[in-house]
Amino acid sequence: MSAEAEAIVTTATADVSSPSKTVAVEPVAADTTPDNAPAVSTEGSGKAEQERAEKILKGKELFSQGSRNFLVKSYDEAADELSQVCQLYEEVYGELADELGQPLLLYAKALIAMALDENKVIDVPDEAADDDDEDVDDDEEESAEDGAAKKEEKKDTKEAANGASSSNGKELDTIKEGSDEADSTGEAEQAQSDEKPSKKVPTGVDEVSSSNGGGGAAVNDDERPSTSNGEVTASCSNGAAPAVEEEPEEEEGVSGSLQLAWEILEAAAQIFSRQGLSGLPYLAEVQTELANIEFENGILEAAREDYEKALKIHGELPTRNRRALAELHYKIGLTYLMQQLNKEGATALRQSSVLIEEEIAEIKGKDEPSERDRNNMLDLEETKQEILAKIQEIEEMQAQTIAEVRAALDSYIKPMSSGDAAAASSSSSSSANGAASSSSSSSKGAAAASSSTISSSSAKPTDITHLIKRKKPEDPSSEAEALCSPAKRAAV
């Protein structure tokens, strides 16, 4: 054995046999119990920190995915991912923490966009149903025409068969009866076989007419009810009825999404208002989204007030975002126009166009504008032209309204003025006639008075000679007769 090995063995035996070493080992064994307890607590805290870090990392990944889906307008997926982000951040940071501000804002915007898309898509199934109805009607007309043609062919064949039977006798009659029975049984079997696929496919008119042949088509045309009460119409109505029944559910979903977005925005507003100057841009965006919800619900005055609040918040920012300001003025103008306040709406739209012109001038003033700046400038130019066209339309509408009002007033005032003139002329003529009549009457009265005075002054007797009966003059013959006759003589 070598010297080194002997030294190792001797030192090992010395360590085992040494009492001081055993005494030194005893306190170490006694100290292991308290040393193990903090080791367990550190392991638990390490796991908690690890879980917390994993949640934060997962939340960041989900937030980036949700932001990307929001930008590409996949609002359903964005809303799902951002809701998970909000849940994870609330577990990690607590309720209404500063880290929850931006996820809540983007989540609310995704809900609003999703509700708007659902609201736009509501009428599409009805249009599709109308198209289906038109297609089914066309198919039914075609199948009816085919059936009529096939019926005529069948009648021709039957007439030919009848002529042959009359010429050939009873044998052909029996053959024809057998063929008719075979046709009837075949048609019944085909009708039964056609009822099964017609139940499965409600609108398969072309398939039924093409698979059955001549006789089957004729049977289907006879057995199938008309369009007003038939299976095809029933299937279309059954297909359209769920769409009509689903409309209230879709409207409830839209209102529920907007209500949830409203509550989320209120929570985000509390977070950003607590952050001070750094949270003002997000607070202005929150106020704008609240106004958008009110605008979509038709609460125009409240929406306009919230838009004006957003304008006020933008005024407190150190940098001026002209595009956001132009959009706010445009929305305010729309609220005015929807309330038939054309003058105020045109004023707001002009302010929006002025801000857009300033933004375009700033982009043009750059020495080397980027591709993004050039694209933005083109978009702004297009938006400006649309706003100016809207303003021109409003002005033309106002001018037309004013012209119509003036024409109506003129048409109303002219008859009145002509009536007044006629009344005035009639009154003047009547007054003139009255004056003339009064003058004539007065002249007549004066003449009568003068004649009365003249008659009274002259005192001429009235001529009543025509009333006096005069005696006939006595003839001399009568006087001689009277003298001759003793009877007529006067007594002396």
UniProtKB/Swiss-Prot annotation:
Gene Ontology BP annotations: CENP-A containing chromatin assembly; DNA replication-dependent chromatin assembly; protein stabilization
Biased composition (Polar residues): 226-238
Start-end of each TPR repeat: 284-317, 326-359
PTM annotation (Phosphothreonine): residues: T32, T33, T185
Family matches, as InterPro entries: NASP-like (IPR051730), TPR-like_helical_dom_sf (IPR011990), TPR_rpt (IPR019734)
Domain of life: Eukaryota
Chain positions with Phosphoserine modification: S179, S184, S193, S478, S485
Subcellular location as annotated: Cytoplasm; Nucleus; Cytoplasm, Perinuclear region
Main location: cytoplasm
UniProt GO molecular function: histone binding; histone chaperone activity
Ranges of biased composition (kind: Basic and acidic residues): 147-159, 170-179
KO phenotype (gene knockout): Eggs laid by mutant females have reduced viability with evidence of cell cycle defects, and many fail to hatch.
Coiled coil regions in record: 377-400
GO CC terms: nucleoplasm; nucleus; perinuclear region of cytoplasm
Acidic residues: compositionally biased ranges: 124-145, 244-253
Record's compositionally biased regions (Low complexity): 1-14, 418-459
Keywords: Coiled coil, Cytoplasm, Nucleus, Phosphoprotein, Repeat, TPR repeat
Region feature Disordered, mapped onto this chain: 1-52, 123-254, 418-492
Family affiliation: Belongs to the NASP family.
Subunit details: Interacts with the histone H3-H4 heterodimer; the interaction with H4 is probably indirect and mediated by H3 (His3, His3.3A and His3.3B). Interacts with His2Av; this interaction directly or indirectly destabilizes His2Av.
Function: Component of the histone chaperone network. Binds and stabilizes histone H3-H4 not bound to chromatin to maintain a soluble reservoir and modulate degradation by chaperone-mediated autophagy. May also bind and stabilize monomeric H3. Maternal effect gene essential for early embryogenesis.
Protein name: Nuclear autoantigenic sperm protein homolog
